[in-house]
């Protein structure tokens, strides 16, 4: 079975200014290319949609920003898993979906690196999946820590990927995934 592409929270809400300055300005384009390749090969795709319980959140159902970004929107036959936490496995049927597909390898991309992507990657790794993260297909935003230090989106992106790599996932570029995905395994 080919790897399953899991796209996390690629909704219009990701552009809301309340999340701060974002990095990876080409991420949507890169995810769209990866998604197009997955579709051409007939490989499984799962879209994760944030259904925030906070009615003021741009991710709240019913708000215009709750919609998927058009360039990575799911096709009618593609699976959508709705979540209400920062981890796509908690309180959802994602594990059952992946078991039904027969997935052992996951390619996880989306937003935001330091929140939902990180939580989902960690959980997937802990559950025994072989996880791949295309570094050019995940978006981080600026972060200020409790001491008041400001971290740019680029710094957050690099730090988060370095923390996850090895213990929870393999980090690579989307071009590497596109060229490798025709094989039986990505390893």
Predicted regions and their residues:
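Active-site-adjacent betaalpha module
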Residues: 2-4, 32-36, 40-41, 58-187
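Extracytoplasmic cell-surface/polysaccharide-interacting catalytic and binding patches
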Residues: 3-7, 11-12
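Short acidic, Gly/Ser-rich segments with clustered Asp/Glu that frequently serve as metal-coordination loops
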Residues: 13-17
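Short glycine-enriched, charge-decorated loop/helix-capping segments at active-site entrances
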Residues: 18-25, 56-59, 148-150
